[in-house]
Amino acid sequence: MKRASSGGSRLLAWVLWLQAWRVATPCPGACVCYNEPKVTTSCPQQGLQAVPTGIPASSQRIFLHGNRISHVPAASFQSCRNLTILWLHSNALARIDAAAFTGLTLLEQLDLSDNAQLHVVDPTTFHGLGHLHTLHLDRCGLRELGPGLFRGLAALQYLYLQDNNLQALPDNTFRDLGNLTHLFLHGNRIPSVPEHAFRGLHSLDRLLLHQNHVARVHPHAFRDLGRLMTLYLFANNLSMLPAEVLMPLRSLQYLRLNDNPWVCDCRARPLWAWLQKFRGSSSEVPCNLPQRLADRDLKRLAASDLEGCAVASGPFRPIQTSQLTDEELLSLPKCCQPDAADKASVLEPGRPASAGNALKGRVPPGDTPPGNGSGPRHINDSPFGTLPSSAEPPLTALRPGGSEPPGLPTTGPRRRPGCSRKNRTRSHCRLGQAGSGASGTGDAEGSGALPALACSLAPLGLALVLWTVLGPC
C-alpha cells in the first residue's frame, strides 16, 4: 500500500509540474507548443502577418513557415537563446532588420527560402551565427550578395542561393566559408566567374552553376577547389573553357558541360586534351560551331578536327541556342597562337600584311596575282577553320623570320623533260611541244622550247650522216 501511495504521489507531482510549466510558458494562440523531441513552437500556415509574440524562451525549434509575414523586426527571437532551428520560408518577407537574429548563437538551421519579395539582405544580418551550418536563401528574388554577407559563418556547410536574380559573383564573397561543402547557385543570371569568386572554399564538394548566363570563367576561379567532386556548368553561354580552369579539380568525379554554345576549333584543343585524360563521369560537350561539327561531341573528335578559327572578327550571325551578344563574341580570342613561331607572324582575320608581318608579300603557289583584285588568303579567312587548296599553310608551320615552312621547295620550277635519245619519234616530240606550250613565259618557256627544237632537227642530222657515209647516188 505504501508503494502504491508513493507512486501516485509522484504522478500527481509530475502533472502539477507540467501544468505549472504551461502557465509559466504560455504558447501563442495560433501555435502549438510541445517538448518532445525538442522544445518546439510550431505555427505553420496560420495566416500570420507578423512574428507572434510570447514565444517560449526555452524554444529550440520555431516553425513559422507558410504564413504572410512581411517583416522580421530586430531582436524578434533574442530571448530564445537555445534556438537551433528557425523556419521562415514561404512567407511574404520583404524586409529583415539587420539585428533580427541577434543573440541566436546556437542557431544551426535558418530557412528563409520562397520569399520572392526579399530582394536584398543587409550584409550584417547573419553576423554572430557562428554555429549555423545550413542557410536557405533560394527563391528570394535576391539581386546581389552584399560584401561581408557571409562573414564569420565558419561552421556553414550548406548554402542555397539558387533561383534568384543574382547578376554577379563578387570576389571573396565566400572567403570565410572554409567548411562549406555544398554551394547551390543555379538558376540565376550570373554572366561570368571572376578570379576570387570561390576563394577559401577548400572543403567544397558540390558546386552547381548551371542555368546561368556564364560566358567566361577566369582561369584561376577554381584554384581553391581541390576537394570538389561535382561541378555543373550546363545550360550557360560557354563557348570555350581554358583547360587551366579545370586543372586544380583533382577530386572531380562528375562534370556536366552540355547545353552550351561550344566552339570546336583550335581554341578547344586544351579542353579536348583535358577531357581525354578525365576519368570521372562527364556529359556530352556538343559543338555549336563550326557548322561541319554541329552537334558532335567534342570528346569524340580527333585532334585533326580542331583546326582554324570558327569565329572571326567582324559582324556575326547569331549562334544557335545561345544568348551571346556581338560584344561577347568579339571578346573571344581571334585565333590560336603558334607554338614556336614569332607572334608577329600571326594575322588576324581581315588584317592586311604589315612591315612586321612574316607573311608580307608572300603569294602561295596557285593563288592569283595581286593585280586581279584578290590578295593572299590565310587559313583564318577560310570558312569554319577549314583549309582550302588556295589557302596558305597553317601559321604554326612558319619559321621565325618569315622563312618557308618545312617541306616546300626552295629551287625554281622544274623543267619538263625533253625527248630521250631512245624515243626520238615525231609523236613524242609533238607531245613535248604541247606540254611546253602550256607552261608560262620566261625561263620556263625557254627551257621547254629547246628540247622541242632538238627533236625537230633530228631527222635532218640523220640524213646528213647517211649522205656522208654512202656518198651521192
From Swiss-Prot:
<keyword id="KW-0449">Lipoprotein</keyword>
<feature type="repeat" description="LRR 5">
    <location>
        <begin position="155"/>
        <end position="176"/>
    </location>
</feature>
<dbReference type="GO" id="GO:0043198">
    <property type="term" value="C:dendritic shaft"/>
</dbReference>
<dbReference type="InterPro" id="IPR032675">
    <property type="entry name" value="LRR_dom_sf"/>
</dbReference>
<feature type="disulfide bond">
    <location>
        <begin position="264"/>
        <end position="287"/>
    </location>
</feature>
<feature type="domain" description="LRRCT">
    <location>
        <begin position="260"/>
        <end position="311"/>
    </location>
</feature>
<feature type="compositionally biased region" description="Basic residues">
    <location>
        <begin position="413"/>
        <end position="429"/>
    </location>
</feature>
<keyword id="KW-1015">Disulfide bond</keyword>
<feature type="signal peptide">
    <location>
        <begin position="1"/>
        <end position="26"/>
    </location>
</feature>
<feature type="disulfide bond">
    <location>
        <begin position="27"/>
        <end position="33"/>
    </location>
</feature>
<feature type="repeat" description="LRR 2">
    <location>
        <begin position="82"/>
        <end position="103"/>
    </location>
</feature>
<dbReference type="GO" id="GO:0030426">
    <property type="term" value="C:growth cone"/>
</dbReference>
<feature type="repeat" description="LRR 1">
    <location>
        <begin position="58"/>
        <end position="79"/>
    </location>
</feature>
<dbReference type="GO" id="GO:0005783">
    <property type="term" value="C:endoplasmic reticulum"/>
</dbReference>
<dbReference type="GO" id="GO:0035374">
    <property type="term" value="F:chondroitin sulfate binding"/>
</dbReference>
<keyword id="KW-0325">Glycoprotein</keyword>
<dbReference type="GO" id="GO:0023041">
    <property type="term" value="P:neuronal signal transduction"/>
</dbReference>
<feature type="disulfide bond">
    <location>
        <begin position="31"/>
        <end position="43"/>
    </location>
</feature>
<dbReference type="GO" id="GO:0150052">
    <property type="term" value="P:regulation of postsynapse assembly"/>
</dbReference>
<feature type="repeat" description="LRR 4">
    <location>
        <begin position="131"/>
        <end position="152"/>
    </location>
</feature>
<feature type="propeptide" description="Removed in mature form">
    <location>
        <begin position="448"/>
        <end position="473"/>
    </location>
</feature>
<dbReference type="GO" id="GO:0010977">
    <property type="term" value="P:negative regulation of neuron projection development"/>
</dbReference>
<keyword id="KW-0336">GPI-anchor</keyword>
<dbReference type="GO" id="GO:0009897">
    <property type="term" value="C:external side of plasma membrane"/>
</dbReference>
<keyword id="KW-0732">Signal</keyword>
<feature type="domain" description="LRRNT">
    <location>
        <begin position="27"/>
        <end position="57"/>
    </location>
</feature>
<dbReference type="GO" id="GO:0008201">
    <property type="term" value="F:heparin binding"/>
</dbReference>
<feature type="glycosylation site" description="N-linked (GlcNAc...) asparagine">
    <location>
        <position position="372"/>
    </location>
</feature>
<feature type="glycosylation site" description="N-linked (GlcNAc...) asparagine">
    <location>
        <position position="179"/>
    </location>
</feature>
<feature type="compositionally biased region" description="Gly residues">
    <location>
        <begin position="434"/>
        <end position="445"/>
    </location>
</feature>
<keyword id="KW-0433">Leucine-rich repeat</keyword>
<feature type="disulfide bond">
    <location>
        <begin position="266"/>
        <end position="335"/>
    </location>
</feature>
<comment type="function">
    <text>Receptor for RTN4, OMG and MAG. Functions as a receptor for the sialylated gangliosides GT1b and GM1. Besides, functions as a receptor for chondroitin sulfate proteoglycans. Can also bind heparin. Intracellular signaling cascades are triggered via the coreceptor NGFR. Signaling mediates activation of Rho and downstream reorganization of the actin cytoskeleton. Mediates axonal growth inhibition. Mediates axonal growth inhibition and plays a role in regulating axon regeneration and neuronal plasticity in the adult central nervous system. Plays a role in postnatal brain development.</text>
</comment>
<feature type="repeat" description="LRR 7">
    <location>
        <begin position="203"/>
        <end position="224"/>
    </location>
</feature>
<dbReference type="GO" id="GO:0098978">
    <property type="term" value="C:glutamatergic synapse"/>
</dbReference>
<comment type="similarity">
    <text>Belongs to the Nogo receptor family.</text>
</comment>
<feature type="disulfide bond">
    <location>
        <begin position="309"/>
        <end position="336"/>
    </location>
</feature>
<dbReference type="GO" id="GO:0007409">
    <property type="term" value="P:axonogenesis"/>
</dbReference>
<dbReference type="GO" id="GO:0043025">
    <property type="term" value="C:neuronal cell body"/>
</dbReference>
<dbReference type="GO" id="GO:0048681">
    <property type="term" value="P:negative regulation of axon regeneration"/>
</dbReference>
<keyword id="KW-0358">Heparin-binding</keyword>
<feature type="repeat" description="LRR 8">
    <location>
        <begin position="227"/>
        <end position="248"/>
    </location>
</feature>
